[in-house]
């Protein structure tokens, strides 16, 4: 891959390297009987990250855990996919070009107020963006990257 690589050795092991050479790996151990849902009742998750490898990998992990997840690679694409996919959750990176994750989250809340939003960031300096959203009356949960996939899965299943 041009922007990194990903590898799934088994259903319980994962690893990826992003375009900046940052590597993440781990073991996934969960009760798949509890997580796998019938196709028509699976929670839909739209995963948004400007690093395609991260968006693709997180969507694949969530799909393997029983969710119906698709990736988007920028805010504009996410808005377009949200209009067709009608996700229960949007999981978005905060720092993206053109439309950042907070701007995307605000646009989603205006159009789809029942959609849950989870912001992800590997950068500590995003408090100004979050504060701007709060001044506009929006509250969002933030999880720092890199994040273990089980933490994401747990957050989505607990928030449902």
Map each language-model feature to its residues.
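Alpha4 helix (beta4-alpha4-beta5 surface) of REC/receiver domains from two-component response regulators
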Residues: 103, 124-144, 150-155
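Hydrophobic/aromatic residues positioned on beta-strands within the core alpha/beta folds
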Residues: 120-122
């Amino acid at each position: 891959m041009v922007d990194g690589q990903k590898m799934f050795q088994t259903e319980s092991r994962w690893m990826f390297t992003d375009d900046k050479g940052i590597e993440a790996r781990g073991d996934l151990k969960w009760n798949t009987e509890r997580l796998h849902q019938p196709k028509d009742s699976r929670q839909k998750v739209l995963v948004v990250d400007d690093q395609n490898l991260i968006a693709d990998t997180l969507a694949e992990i969530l799909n393997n855990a029983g969710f119906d997840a698709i990736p988007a690679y920028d805010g504009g694409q996410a808005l377009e996919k949200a209009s067709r996919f009608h996700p229960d959750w949007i999981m978005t990176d905060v720092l993206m070009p053109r439309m950042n994750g907070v701007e995307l989250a605000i646009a989603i809340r205006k159009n789809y107020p029942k959609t849950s939003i989870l912001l992800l960031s590997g950068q500590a300096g995003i408090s100004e963006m979050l504060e701007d959203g709060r001044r506009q009356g929006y509250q969002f949960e933030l999880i720092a990257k890199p994040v273990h996939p089980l933490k994401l899965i747990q957050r989505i299943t607990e928030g449902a």
